[in-house]
């Protein structure tokens, strides 16, 4: 097959294209069979997504556990050719059965099914309406599940997983006693998907709870008739998981094969910086053997680029890692989000921005504007998300200080003054369509005691409970105040390095104080106390030098007019009047005397603000096993927020922890520590003081919902639970009738020398009794139809037909010409 012919289906339209290697040729897999993989084969999958106006493509070649070496080599070659065909920009992935990447599994929301056999044994990907099936599927996983065909025996079962007995016209789900509701729900959705996609909706589904088998005697009879007498079920088998701590260890190697042998040289370990990557070379990034990345520089030769995957496999062999280790190759300038976030920061070069921080979300620049239309924040939550603002800060503000481990209200005139020796709670109330909404900020001073830090967290829970769990909780570390926090104090936020604001404080104020004032409007301005020495100055900012008798407002050469105006307002608040303005370079001698004399300070021209390339990511978090585990959800939607889970949304400069209404108590109580551990163990070496926002299901602010396309606030009230879906399946009567018919047909097949007592439809349609076969009862012609013909003639299964009243059966037989 020519390449142009093999890739003729490739377009820039979003979606998934799957090919199977058949006799060393690429053969397209029908859409209805996507997610089904034969264990004896190799596949190539192309995923195309649009992020704004940009195209993102990923090529995966999948290796079945029983595939031949020739097929694996062929798949690798076709992957390289497809990459060339698409201009060398796609990210390439090597996927091995049972060890697929989160990205790969994320394509198949209903799950992956591993099927026995392959091309060599004549197995084909068939279209819908196939009922000649008899298999047992072992279903594992909770979010992106995998179902493997296993031996039709009770020996295949265990207490912790879900199993589907698929008999074509009947699918029976057996839930292990130790499986959770999420796994059961996903398995049921898989059973429904098999019914609808492969059986045209014409199959019956039944469910057995493994710890309540006596409640489903009819279904258990079907299982035992098929699998034999029930034996003792084996204990649960723990899933193979990699904790976040293991993933946090990364190593960068330079790769060379100039001597004819693979040579790898260690370059650096965590934290990695982007500047380590030379555009003329190739590198391997090793994530503790859990995943291998190969980075191909733009200046590397074509031969070097094409050999990248084989180099990775040689590296895996050299390190003694399992052959199933996941490999991802990325191109210089087209790196995946997962690769970029292994670095301390990843900048987009040659892009100019203003003074504010800029993020490139999916490579589309999102600039934090100084001014924005507040009315857009709730009608367009994506604006709120990008701006990190729920409103303009004009809501109601209440402030408490932790004093003797209790909450003490802070008087209004002291709102906006925060001391490094204290902890505070700030409750912000705003209105959305007549409904009050709340944000609870927990501000923790750098010099606060451990008891006060613990008390602030405890008191936050108390306040949260007073409002029915509605507040969004935001942990704020001193100096890391988010924009909305600054906005509620209207440009009059002052942070003292130490001390306390509590009454009766006997600690004297220092004779000289120096404040660095940063910000250019009322939503982003604050004054932060720094060491009162000349070395603290910076030419790009404004500083206030304060003493009891004198006040100087020092304008650095690089400060803007807006910054100076905001600093002047703040200085008037701190000085109870005007301060003397001093331009950099025109300082009087007493100015330097107060700072202890002149000293070198940062006086370089303001650096152009770099553009950070950030991909917002969603993770499922768990620490209930004692190990901290995170699983990424790729191409996430609101549907991925399951009420039974704790989810983490990482927007880089802040982290949201979303707590589902049905999450277990342990994970709810440990929410903050979960988010903190995520930051500490992040491979890139994240700032542990990154703001953390804790959000409960049903109380999501627009700064959170804006990251999800078409957020639906009613999705959980309208969505169906596992129990509701289970109840919709009906009783077991139809299943028993169908399986009885199937058993009788099998018995007649085994006992009759003349073959099964089924006849073609055209034979049974004959109207004269004498023309019918001798063994056909003319009043019950439907009994002589095969299962497939029965569904074809009546449009329903045999079990559904039998459950109808007699007059309805008669009517259908007349309409079909079988009466």
UniProtKB/Swiss-Prot annotation:
Q: Name one GO cellular component term.
A: axon
What Pfam families does the database record attribute to this sequence? Gelsolin (PF00626), VHP (PF02209)
Stretches the record annotates as Core: 1-731
Positions bearing Phosphotyrosine: 85, 758
Location, primary (coarse class): cytoplasm
Q: What GO terms are given for molecular function? A: actin binding; actin filament binding; Arp2/3 complex binding; phosphatidylinositol-4,5-bisphosphate binding
Where does tissue-level expression of this protein occur? Answer: Expressed in dorsal root ganglion (DRG) neurons and superior cervical ganglia (SCG). Expressed in podocytes.
* Presence of the UniProt keyword Repeat in the record: yes
Location of this chain's protein in the cell: Cytoplasm, Cytoskeleton; Cell projection, Neuron projection; Cell projection, Axon; Cell projection, Lamellipodium
Stretches the record annotates as Required for interaction with F-actin: 628-819
Partners and quaternary state? Associates (via C-terminus) with actin. Interacts with F-actin. Interacts with SCARF1; the interaction occurs in embryonic dorsal root ganglions at 18 dpc and induces neurite-like outgrowth. Interacts with PLCE1. Interacts with ACTR2 and ACTR3; associates with the ARP2/3 complex.
Family label = Belongs to the villin/gelsolin family.
Q: What is known of its domains?
A: The C-terminal domain is necessary for the induction of long fine actin-containing filopodia-like structures in fibroblast and neurite-like outgrowth.
Function, as annotated:
Ca(2+)-regulated actin-binding protein which plays an important role in actin bundling. May have a unique function in the morphogenesis of neuronal cells which form ganglia. Required for SREC1-mediated regulation of neurite-like outgrowth. Plays a role in regenerative sensory axon outgrowth and remodeling processes after peripheral injury in neonates. Involved in the formation of long fine actin-containing filopodia-like structures in fibroblast. Plays a role in ciliogenesis.
The protein, known as: Advillin
Q: What is the native source organism of this protein?
A: Rattus norvegicus (Rat)
